[in-house]
């Protein structure tokens, strides 16, 4: 996307981003946080207004409060029109492991052992 932006094929000036996930207990300035990753690899390289970029607050000790805040934020933006995401090694989305029932609202999950092992390389 940054290459498209550099070529003038993509404009970020009027969009809002709502990140899918963040690690709990890691602040936005930590190099392992998704917030930091997005700043380094996208937000700082395109013409997006930083006040239009949203990532869950991994440092909010009250996870229920943070989930409610994020749901209100999404609703206030009119919902999510397009979601760009990756799939985990076992098909998980946003650390939600494959299951028969999928929780739609913002929530916190515990990582499976396989997911922890797969992501361990980012914390070495």
Regions from the PLM with identified roles:
Residues 1-7:
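Glycine-rich N-terminal segment of FAD-binding domains in flavoprotein oxidoreductases
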Residues 7-14:
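Active-site cofactor/substrate anionic-group-binding motifs, chiefly glycine-
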Residues 14-21:
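Short internal beta-strands
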Residues 26-124:
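Conserved phosphate- and dinucleotide-binding cores of soluble alpha/beta proteins
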């Amino acid at each position: 996307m940054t290459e498209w932006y550099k070529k003038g094929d993509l404009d970020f000036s009027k969009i809002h981003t709502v990140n899918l996930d963040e690690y709990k207990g890691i602040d936005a300035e930590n190099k392992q946080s998704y917030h930091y990753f997005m700043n380094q690899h996208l937000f700082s390289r395109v013409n997006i207004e930083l006040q239009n970029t949203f990532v869950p607050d991994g440092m909010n000790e009250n996870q229920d409060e943070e989930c409610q805040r994020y749901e209100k934020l999404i609703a206030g933006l009119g919902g999510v029109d397009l979601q760009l995401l990756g799939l985990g090694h076992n098909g998980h989305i946003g650390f939600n492991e494959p299951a028969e029932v999928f929780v739609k609202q913002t929530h916190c999950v515990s990582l499976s052992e396989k997911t922890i092992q797969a992501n361990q390389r980012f914390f070495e």
